Amino acid sequence: MKVKEVAQKIEPKMKKTIEAFQHEIASIRTGKATTTLLDRVKVEAYGQLMPLKQVGNIGVMDVHTLIVQVWDKSMVSATERAIRDANLGLNPSADGQNIRVSIPPLTEERRKEFVKLTKKFGEDSKVSLRNLRRDMIHDIEKLEKDKAISEDDKNRGKKEADDLLHKFEKQLSDLIALKEKEIMEV
């Protein structure tokens, strides 16, 4: 195995870390109605917890309102309760088989909490990226120890690991800044 192969093994994992971060922050409120806001909501249905999107359709009515069309009428109250209990600061109201979810404007304090949460998710992702870099360097050092590569190749490999880390940390920082701007926008 050569340095390039080690890098090709690690880079997709770093991309997945960025994608996981994007998915994680998608459910953080920004004051606008988006269907991803309800991604983490689990409904007690048929004796088990199910994701909300498996119980009904989620749609955007307008900038400040989501609508959930529950497929099974008997699940309306459980779905409404799950949305209310999800600790998202939302107050759903049932209307037949539909549930309207009004998105209240965020207070300054709540916005700051969401920014802090975004930064926490970002820091967790940076730790994952650094761990992947460490694994890459470990693999490269093992190759050198096994005499599969020269010391120069090892040093080039370490530099490549650092370059990969910087590239993905920059992407992460840009995403954090963008989400922070989105949250603080009134």
Swiss-Prot record:
Subcellular location(s) of the protein: Cytoplasm
Cysteines joined through disulfide linkages: none
CDD domains in the record: RRF
Keyword Nucleotidyltransferase belongs to the record: no
A biological process from GO: translational termination
Any one GO CC term of the record: cytoplasm
NCBIfam families, sorted: frr
Known function: Responsible for the release of ribosomes from messenger RNA at the termination of protein biosynthesis. May increase the efficiency of translation by recycling ribosomes from one round of translation to another.
HAMAP family for the chain: RRF
Protein family: Belongs to the RRF family.
Protein name (Swiss-Prot/TrEMBL): Ribosome-recycling factor
Organism listed in the record: Chlorobium limicola (strain DSM 245 / NBRC 103803 / 6330)
